[in-house]
Amino acid sequence: MDYFTLFGLPARYQIDTQALSLRFQDLQRQYHPDKFANGTQAQQLAAVQQSATINQAWQTLRHPLTRAEYLLSLHGFDLASEQHTVRDTAFLMEQLTLREELDDIDQSKDDVRLESFIKRVQKMFDARLQQMVEQLDNAAWDAAADTVRKLRFLDKLRSSAEQLEEKLLDF
């Protein structure tokens, strides 16, 4: 059973996150291992396994990138373990330039510049995310997979910038 079916949701990117949360809570209560403490060893093991599956499904579907990766995996794209990378040289050059800029900001400890950088990267991420949503909605799986690969780069860059922000705030 796929994760969408487990949560009673259609297998598509745009989901009702409130319904996801409510169903997660219901499933947690229903399959919590403590409810099977007096059961047989097989029942206890099954409850632990089911609970682990529910938690993994929840973690996967609640985050935009992992939800997209999972949806793509249902259509034959195993992005989690693939060796493919982005082949768009202009995008890769842009990423190198942004990384260098972030390094410069780190060296200068310029929090104002960092704030502007974070906003710019977030806008880039949001634009790619919208592009990916449209591609997934239109079943453009190859294009969506490529966009997810690019979103990974931007997500890591955003995370690095946010870590630098925490570092500068503690400084």
Swiss-Prot record:
Keyword DNA-binding in record: no
Transmembrane annotation, as ranges: none
Classification via Gene3D superfamilies: DnaJ domain, HscB, C-terminal domain
Pfam families recorded: HSCB_C
GO cellular component, as recorded: iron-sulfur cluster transfer complex
Keywords: Chaperone
Gene Ontology biological-process entries: [2Fe-2S] cluster assembly; protein complex oligomerization; protein folding
HAMAP family named among the record's database cross-references: HscB
Protein family (similarity comment): Belongs to the HscB family.
Subunit structure and binding partners: Interacts with HscA and stimulates its ATPase activity. Interacts with IscU.
Function: Co-chaperone involved in the maturation of iron-sulfur cluster-containing proteins. Seems to help targeting proteins to be folded toward HscA.
Entry protein name: Co-chaperone protein HscB
Species in which this protein is naturally found: Salmonella agona (strain SL483)
Gene (UniProt): hscB
